[in-house]
Amino acid sequence: MKRLVGIFFTATLVVAAQDTRYPPDGSQIPGPGGRSTPDWVEELSEWQMATGGEHEAWLNDLRQWRHERLIRMGYDDTEYRRPELLWTQRNFIQPQMMAEERYFYDPAAGKYTVDRYLDDLDKRYGGIDSVLIWPVYPNIGIDNRNQWDLARDLPGSVAGLRRMVEDFHRRGVRVFFPSMPWDTGTRDVGQPYWSAAAELMAEIGSDGVNGDTFNGMPRAYRTASDQTGHPVTFEPEGSPSADEMLMWNNQSWGYWKYPFAPLVSKLKWLEPRHMINVCDRWARDKTDNLQAAFFNGVGYESWENIWGIWNQIAPRDAEALRRVAYIERQFAELLVAREWEPYAPTLQYGVFATRFPGEGRTLWTVVNRNEYDVGGEQIQVRHVEGARYYDVWSGAEIKPRIDGAGAVLSFAMEAKGFGAILAVLPGVAPRNLDATLAQTRQWARVPLASLSNEWKFLPQHIVETAPTKLPSASPPGMVHVPAGAFDFRVTGIEIEGFNWAGLDVQYPWEDAPRRGHHHLLTMKPFYIDRYPVTNAGFKKFLDAAQYHPQDDHNFLKDWRNGTYPDGWANKPVTCVSLEDARAYAAWAGKRLPHEWEWQYAAQGTDGRLYPWGNSWDERAVAAPYKGRDLPGPADVDAHPAGASPFGVMDMTGNIWLWTDEFVDEHTRSGVVRGGSYYRPQGSMWYFPQAYKLNEHGKYLLMAPSKDRAGTLGFRCAMDE
């Protein structure tokens, strides 16, 4: 304990040794006065950020802190001077895109639709500079495929991925993929994670790696990438826990605080060429995010499809994003200015500006944090005879009021709005200025306030299932489930999403998707397979129907030479997609059960938690497996103690089972039931089990190649 106290005391002294009146608060630095909310009486004049002396003192203090901090870091800016990574300094807008995004891939046509995806973003908010493609969570852990397996299981595998990346490059968009340090329970990749990531990026021609849950990606990633001859950039999700990591993490995300007076990015202050993408994925109103990004001259994570939950950027925010991004792109070289000055003095309360000086011209990004319009004189700047001033946000030249050595600039700002001012010295002709002003002038005709900022959930619909022909007699191998009243109660167990409207699924009788579901159903009689379809049963189908899917990647992955392994005849068939299962059912004159039919057959009418009762019984289920390979499920008849009240077997704990499919404009998903024997260890982020009969899994769908899983099979139903 004494040693620990000594270490703590020494560490405290080291931190305190770098003296500053304005120490960083995490990844952000407070403004002049060190406060983020004003004292309304005593500090009113300070919070106008006028031309008093405190701003200069604050700025000098921050400059000294930066100078000393870079010495302490042994700072080397080599990575920011590398020609092949200079693009990162213009990488302003980046969505995290689910691989299951329907605008990105068309499973019916079997092709990537990159143009459709990008055209939609161009139309809605002005387009993107890069995209983070997300093929892993939340589906990872349903079987033992690791993060790199799931990427390679995307349609077309490596060759298809390379063509898809080229499609993005053709549109000027860079491509990122993630790396997850927490994925330690699935298949062992057999090499360091940084090597696996670097090799995949080189194979497919990708541009960057996003470090999911990383607070700074270790230097080993940089080294491994360089060794492939295909260097990529690194972008940790969290702000680097050690400032030294800034030297090889050219980008990062910003999970920021949003007080009334904007905070300053510590990382950008230390290294102005470091790109931050401000991320606040669950925010429905993006105003704070966009104002903080614009004030700091950094980017934004335009994330809308959050694990299959749609959080669309509303029209007002989308238009603000279009204009913010356009101005940042037009003046990107100014936004990396070494001597940028946050909190440039302003003349109006609640208006905050940042100065970005360059050769012959200077840009100010301005935000109005007030809930009302602000007009008139806004900022006073040092004046040079012959200089011209432009309201870039509105596309107009400003005629200044000259006050001694200063120019006082007047312009209007909307409530919670934005401004951008450009000063141009005499003899300087900025590139494309006329076109830039013409574009922003056109946009300014539509005030942001005229656009809706209302958030709306995205409705879903269930994919209809055609009824079967009525059997003339009780079908062999099926159990008759009688008609009856059924109190259907089930909850989605998605790890994230709170209790949002739009989460989970929307049954035909509901007016919105939601996590919790309850409905009293009048069940018609039907038949359901006593056991899941086995390997032997599926082999009969293949032989009789000569079925072979067009997209056959991962199809019957455990089979060899057209048949299942010895001893697997009575095990449930797995590595079959929803399409494969439907094809079998159609051949057999059956269909897949609706989820509520599956639950009724498993639960009966007494609301029990498990098919056999209300207490967990290890004898009734397959033994759980916690290793990193996938040994295969138990035989379907191995656990008779697991029978349901109607005598249906193997409903829980052996394999997941397909039921209904749900679709909205951007995502398809399958409801899977029963849970499986496979339980990967080491992380809370793996696909959660749903052994209880009042819980279900939501499995995101993209294409058969990726959807097929080693623990996912099916059983069939038939109408009576």
Predicted segments with their positions:
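Catalytic domains of carbohydrate-active enzymes, especially glycoside hydrolases
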Residues: 116-136, 203
